[in-house]
């Protein structure tokens, strides 16, 4: 049967199965139980029935488990499924769960052609065995389906049409109005980084300084300081710019937090407990998180620091539980404090302020837009030398260090309370003692959630909080699928999941009308659509929709004869030894993802009779730096190993700038910033825990003319950082002139970066991602570049036969 593209939203309900052991099949379950008892040795067998929904081989929904109901299991569960899949059938599978794996009972097939017209269908569908024959007793499953094509969505490709746009639907947190947002590029912005970027209303864009603001927020807190992190390192200092000193700025963050706790401030920290059983990755040079040191530092002090493992929700199998607790992390990076009212005028009243983004408060994160490799080794980075990509790298052997590019945000107003509530949910689940600040008792002091801007303030923001998290990490999630759905949560096989970050990305991409700009540490997913010549797609499981949504958006614009551009910035390779099998495996997934997208774009261009370069619509970059030697530079006492990547990079005076960002800008009007990568770990909801904000300024929308608010100013400031220049064409990123200009500059910078010799510093950091695109969209090596410069690491990656995909996707 021909496969048809389902691109839109599928509403599905699974009601029940009738008479599972009818027609003489009564011994079916007893045989099943006996078999399980023999293989697993668990005593008397118990049936644990659940049903799943697949679009071909892509799992898009699953019910809870119903125990000991062998004849007529009733789930009555509804699903809201975003889809971008080629499929001939919507497949309902009934299974009996085992401690290890599950036993197939049968599958029911609904042809995609039946739902295409958008009418609701409600029917009993025959359950078939693996040979497509009816199972014993002729059992049927009762389902309801209704498909809403993306073209019928009134927001499709129309941007945010009105200041009253209500935000992403079906989410745990609703959108908040009357908020303030500060956007941060890198941990610090020095005074000499001042691009002139005019905004609406005659203002110029002003940069903010993340770690200075976090230092001030912690220093001035009086009642509470809540921190979550993948890593928090007590030995780092937040203030390092000698031209911008602050009182107390020489303290480490550990000493600062101890001091605040001793003053009576409630300081609570949830730091990921790195269960070192992830040895597979550890030896490949992934950075230690200092979790044990951090806990030790605060032991027997007034700071409550809890090491927080990524515990599974209650409903998984033995294998799933093992995977979650040993392979996945707590990845949210937030700081929540109480703060003085703006322009407080001597008032004792306090409000809540929160920070959300990609920056952990740990070593290797402090950097500026200049991302120097060698010139800060005797100043800001002498005691914070971070280079996990070379074995044995150390300050004593010299640079290049690994520069760090990241993005963060500060949110004020009602949205800041949502971040606080997220912390409280997590603390109640895994924090141990109930020592959260008693907000009810403090209501005379801390004002309740309320707008911090007037409705007519042109700088106001509407902001929504999104997460990837499940009931294993957040307290108070509903128990039943019905209540979960009402709360904007997804129910799975006995776990309740908040997957709203993925939903937010999907909605923003579907709304986009002109361009999308992405910076992310990873870029892989939509594995259901990868080329499957040498892999079994269904075994990969990187099913999130983001890459496919991007390519389908471009395709729709090509078909409509309209311009659209997608710019993606990723690191050269994921942090770690680049030749290692884990890094090579991730690069292989990334290549397959990019290739899938380019094939979609090329196919659409060819269908229009165009042989245009697909890079005019979709283009990938990385960041790097290269510096000539200057007199007075730090001189290391030792040398790197001869003929090592380290030694070659030191001689060539170049290295990648690590892109750790997790950000997307749409049409210069909407921005998502958070901790979530574009991979399955971050977008799944039941893997790594994540948090993000999505927001826009209702007075700065891209309706009749291009948006010129803070989001535009921030993007232009980022482009100034990466390109070393501003140009008029950058104001219209969707235009062919702009994407050609950016591609040309990035191609030139790559040539300078990768050349044998260097006459002067690299004029900018944005480099072409070193891959080619062949005539049918296949991703190929750039001529002469099988390996990243100074390494023996293949740019296109390599399949890892012994690493399970769940670890690297």
Curated annotation (Swiss-Prot):
> Which CDD domains did the record assign?
C2_plant_PLD, PLDc_pPLDalpha_2
Coiled coil (UniProt feature):
none
GO CC terms on record? Answer: plasma membrane
Q: Which InterPro entries match?
A: C2_dom (IPR000008), C2_domain_sf (IPR035892), PLipase_D/transphosphatidylase (IPR001736), PLipase_D_C (IPR024632), PLipase_D_fam (IPR015679), PLipase_D_pln (IPR011402)
Residue pairs linked by disulfide bridges in the UniProt entry: none
Location of the C2 domain: 1-125
Q: Matching PANTHER family, A to Z?
A: PHOSPHOLIPASE D (PTHR18896), PHOSPHOLIPASE D ALPHA 1 (PTHR18896:SF115)
What does this gene product do? Hydrolyzes glycerol-phospholipids at the terminal phosphodiesteric bond. Plays an important role in various cellular processes.
The molecule here is called: Phospholipase D alpha 1
């Amino acid at each position: 049967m021909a496969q048809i593209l389902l691109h839109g939203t599928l509403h599905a309900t699974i009601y029940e199965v009738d008479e599972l052991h009818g027609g003489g099949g009564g011994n079916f379950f007893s045989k099943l139980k006996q078999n399980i008892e023999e293989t697993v040795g668990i005593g008397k067998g118990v049936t644990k029935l659940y049903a799943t929904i697949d679009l071909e081989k892509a799992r898009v929904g699953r019910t809870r488990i119903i125990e000991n109901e062998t004849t007529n299991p009733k789930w009555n569960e509804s699903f809201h499924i975003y889809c971008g899949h080629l499929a001939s059938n919507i497949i309902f599978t009934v299974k009996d769960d085992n401690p290890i794996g599950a036993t197939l009972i049968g599958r029911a097939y609904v042809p995609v052609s039946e739902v295409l017209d958008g009418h609701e269908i409600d029917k009993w569908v025959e359950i078939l065995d693996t040979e497509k024959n009816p199972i014993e007793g002729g059992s049927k499953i009762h389902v309801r389906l209704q498909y809403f094509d993306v073209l019928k969505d009134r927001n499709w490709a129309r941007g945010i049409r009105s200041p009253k746009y209500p935000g992403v639907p079906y989410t745990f947190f609703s959108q908040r109005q009357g908020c303030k947002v500060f956007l941060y590029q890198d941990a610090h912005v020095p005074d000499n980084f001042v691009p002139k970027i005019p905004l609406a209303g005659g203002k110029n864009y002003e940069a903010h300084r993340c770690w200075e603001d976090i230092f001030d927020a912690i220093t001035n807190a009086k009642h509470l300081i809540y921190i979550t992190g993948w890593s928090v390192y007590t030995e780092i200092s937040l203030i390092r710019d000698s031209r911008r000193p602050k009182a107390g700025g020489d303290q480490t963050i550990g000493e600062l937090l101890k001091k605040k706790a001793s003053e009576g401030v409630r300081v609570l920290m949830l730091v990921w407990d790195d269960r070192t059983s992830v040895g597979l990755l550890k030896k490949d040079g992934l950075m230690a998180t200092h979790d044990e040191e951090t806990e030790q530092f605060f032991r027997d002090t007034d700071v409550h620091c809890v090491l927080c493992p990524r515990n599974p929700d209650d409903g998984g199998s033995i294998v799933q539980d093992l995977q979650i607790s040993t392979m996945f992390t707590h990845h949210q990076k937030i700081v929540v404090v109480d703060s003085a009212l703006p322009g407080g005028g001597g008032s004792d009243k306090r409000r809540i302020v929160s920070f959300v983004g990609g920056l952990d408060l740990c070593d290797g994160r402090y950097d500026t837009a200049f991302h120097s490799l060698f010139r800060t080794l005797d100043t800001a980075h002498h005691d914070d030398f971070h280079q996990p990509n070379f074995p044995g790298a150390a300050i004593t052997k010299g640079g290049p260090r690994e520069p760090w590019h990241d993005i963060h945000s500060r949110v004020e107003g009602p949205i800041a309370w949502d971040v606080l509530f997220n912390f409280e949910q997590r603390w109640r689940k895994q924090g141990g003692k109930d020592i959260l600040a008693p907000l009810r008792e403090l209501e005379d002091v801390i004002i309740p959630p309320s707008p911090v801007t007037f409705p007519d303030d042109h700088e106001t923001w509407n902001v929504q909080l999104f997460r990837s998290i499940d009931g294993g990490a957040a307290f108070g999630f509903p128990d039943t699928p019905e209540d979960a759905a009402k709360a904007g949560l997804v129910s799975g096989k006995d776990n309740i999941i908040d997957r709203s970050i993925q939903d937010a990305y999907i909605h923003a991409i579907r709304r986009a009308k002109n361009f999308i700009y992405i910076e992310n540490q990873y870029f892989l997913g939509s594995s259901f659509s990868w080329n499957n010549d040498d892999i079994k797609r269904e075994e990969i499981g990187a099913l999130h929709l983001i890459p496919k949504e991007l390519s389908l958006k471009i395709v729709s614009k090509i078909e409509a004869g309209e311009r659209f551009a997608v710019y993606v910035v990723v690191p050269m390779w994921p942090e770690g030894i680049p030749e290692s099998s884990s890094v090579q495996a991730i690069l292989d997934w990334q290549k397959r993802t990019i290739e899938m997208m380019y094939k979609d774009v090329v196919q659409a261009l060819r269908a229009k009779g165009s042989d245009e370069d697909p890079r005019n619509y979709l283009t990938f970059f990385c960041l790097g730096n290269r510096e000539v030697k200057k007199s007075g530079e730090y001189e290391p006492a030792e040398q790197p190993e001869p003929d090592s990547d380290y030694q070659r990079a030191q001689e060539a005076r170049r290295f990648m700038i690590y892109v750790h960002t997790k950000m997307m800008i749409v049409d210069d009007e909407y921005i998502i910033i958070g901790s979530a990568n574009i991979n399955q770990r971050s977008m799944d909801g039941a893997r790594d825990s994540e948090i993000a904000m999505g927001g826009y300024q209702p007075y700065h929308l891209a309706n009749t003319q291009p948006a010129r608010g803070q989001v535009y100013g921030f993007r232009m400031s980022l482009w100034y950082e990466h390109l070393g220049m501003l140009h008029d064409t950058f104001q219209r990123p969707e235009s062919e002139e702009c994407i050609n200009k950016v591609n040309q500059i990035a191609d030139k910078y790559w040539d300078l970066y990768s050349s044998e010799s260097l006459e002067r510093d690299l004029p900018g950091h944005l480099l072409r991602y070193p891959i080619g695109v062949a005539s049918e969209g296949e991703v190929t090596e750039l001529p002469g570049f099988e390996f990243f410069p100074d390494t023996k690491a293949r740019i296109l990656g390599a399949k890892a036969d012994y690493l399970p995909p769940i670890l690297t996707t």
